[in-house]
Curated annotation (Swiss-Prot):
Protein known as: RAB7A-interacting MON1-CCZ1 complex subunit 1
Compartments reported by the entry: Cytoplasm, Cytosol
Lineage: Eukaryota, Metazoa, Chordata, Craniata, Vertebrata
Species: Danio rerio
Any GO CC annotation of this UniProt entry: cytosol
Classification via PANTHER family: RAB7A-INTERACTING MON1-CCZ1 COMPLEX SUBUNIT 1, UPF0600 PROTEIN C5ORF51
Cytoplasm is among the record's keywords: yes
Main subcellular location: cytoplasm
Keyword Cytoplasm recorded: yes
Pfam families registered for this protein in UniProt: RIMC1
Length: 276
């Protein structure tokens, strides 16, 4: 009973902290859709706590809390993108956003230890948390990639961002276990079966593959001429192998079942010709 109360209080504290943050951000842009949605959910959560809700609702509270985090950080990310990631403030702001997007998963594991995190938050929210962190680092690295002089002075930092981004995006692809084709599931066409077997469940999964391929390409480009990193060799990702494997799947999907659906493979093929 005491543990349940402690968990509920911890989440309540975070909710009211987010409410203050959301209110401050709304003074910048009152009509922002994401901040309005976050504010609406926060009002519901505050009402719940004021009326002494049941602790058994903790998973649902965590899901709502996670959606608030996603909405608020999306607004903050858009500000960074619009400002083209200022060199002086972006590193700190990005680490802050990554921490904010990690907290729901950490809280779910700590506050509902008897259940797996993906059961508490749900597959879609957990996927979104990984996607958002990986996509943020992709956008940041895409901008840095155009700042050649900056990279010359900060290769290790650039490679670290690429490695973190690829790890997050790979985790996103692994949230849903690939469907086994012999587990009794009946598919109406082989294309659907192949998609699910490869872990491709949506357009976002395909875009994730392309992002991974590009980030691996950038890493290989600079990793070959920057071996002074202090990270242990066994902890580094094999960017060339990962990029090649992921982009092969991407091209096969886009030129196979998805042919004519607007997916372009020219860039993927060009990267593959360099990685292989």
């Amino acid at each position: 009973m005491a543990d349940d109360y402690r968990r509920s209080v911890e989440l309540e504290r975070r909710i009211f902290e987010l409410d203050n943050k959301c209110a401050t951000l709304r003074t910048e842009k009152p009509d922002d859709d994401y901040l309005q949605n976050a504010s609406s959910i926060l009002d519901k959560l505050k009402t719940y706590y004021r009326h002494g809700g049941e602790s058994s609702s903790l998973p649902k509270l965590l899901q709502d809390y996670t959606q608030v985090v996603l909405d608020i950080t999306f607004y903050e990310e858009n500000k960074l993108v619009d400002q083209e990631f200022p060199e002086d403030s972006s590193p700190f702001k990005i680490q802050q956003l990554l921490q904010d997007l990690t907290e729901p998963e950490v809280l779910a594991g700590r506050l509902v230890p008897a259940q797996e995190v993906q059961s508490v938050l749900g597959l879609e929210l957990l996927e979104c948390l990984y996607w958002r962190r990986g996509a943020l680092l992709y956008m940041y690295c895409h901008t840095l990639h155009q700042r050649k002089q900056w990279i010359k002075k900060n290769k290790a930092t650039f490679l670290k961002c690429l490695q973190e981004g690829v790890r997050y995006l790979m985790r996103m692809l692994q949230v849903r276990n690939s469907v086994k084709l012999n587990d009794g599931v009946v598919f109406h066409d082989s294309a659907t079966a192949n998609f699910l077997a490869e872990g491709i469940f949506s357009d976002t999964h395909l875009l994730t593959m392309m992002y991974i391929g590009e980030m691996c390409f950038w890493a290989v480009k600079y990793e070959d001429c920057s071996m002074d990193t202090t990270e242990r060799k066994e902890d580094r990702l094999h960017f060339r192998d990962i990029g090649t494997q992921i982009l092969h799947k991407y091209v096969l999907a886009c030129e196979g079942p998805l042919q004519g659906q607007g997916w372009n493979t020219e860039n993927a093929k060009e990267i593959l010709s360099i990685l292989q």
